[in-house]
Amino acid sequence: MTTVRLTVRASPERYQLPEPVDFEQGTMTDLAQKRILLLVHGFANPEDKAQGSYKKFADGLTAVNESFPDAWGAVCEFHWPGDDRRGALASTVTYSFRVESAHASAIRLASFLHEEPGLTPDLDLYIVAHSLGCRLTLEVLREIAKKKDYKGPVVREVALMAAAVPVWDCLSPDGFKPDKTRQEHVLYSRRDMVLHYTFGIGQGIFGERHSAVGLKGRPDKRWDTRTSTGLRHGEYWGNNKVARRASRILGIGPVELPEHYPPQVEFDIAEPPRFRNMAGRLVSWRK
């Protein structure tokens, strides 16, 4: 099955403002499957780096279930100008412009999902995003919610990895609101030095001093599941444990136990093995 590549990146000779969504690879026929997995990269990712990250993630899912994606649905890469073409340092210095670019890209993507005739409400959309791409994703969901006559695919599951999103934006009445029609999952890490240090500096430009969602997984009650990964900021896309966690979100992971069995324990994948073994013995004793 062809991987679809959507882009809002401008041509090199133009200023890096997001353009209308365009098919860089694949067609609407490839995209309009019953289930669509949309991948959204983060901050300071040139297109080739994003493609490499997406491939690692897709390969990880295939390693969990070899029938993915052929028997599951479509895989769609989304590319947006989250970087400055002059390099990583320029991207960091112009962080405020990257945030604005994420917002503008979200508007473009939400319009595409709403207006594209081949994308209809009988299709299910799953989104996995990383870093500043998580903010872009939440912006997309907010834009969709504004459209009372939204005609696009239904968002079923959202997984936010190392989310570069202020916690306050997920608490404020004017921020990103949850929706009972979808599940929202957070994968976070207290060891993420990018979110611990760099994110705070970047947000200070906007007068915001709140910590990032992807650092501690807060606000706790907002998310349907929270998974501590113990990973560094750039380690998510190619991590096997993250792939297994995502596979369960997509419904291609290990089969769940029948209801009459005790519930499975969802261990923190960053926990030391000795704590996992101790918890496992406790569960066995209770049986």
Task: Locate predicted features.
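Gly/Ala-rich beta-loop-alpha elbow adjacent to hydrolase catalytic centers
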Residues: 109, 128-133, 137
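Lipolytic serine-hydrolase domain surface
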Residues: 1-32, 43-58, 62-124, 142-157, ...
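The conserved beta1-alpha1 loop
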Residues: 38-41, 130
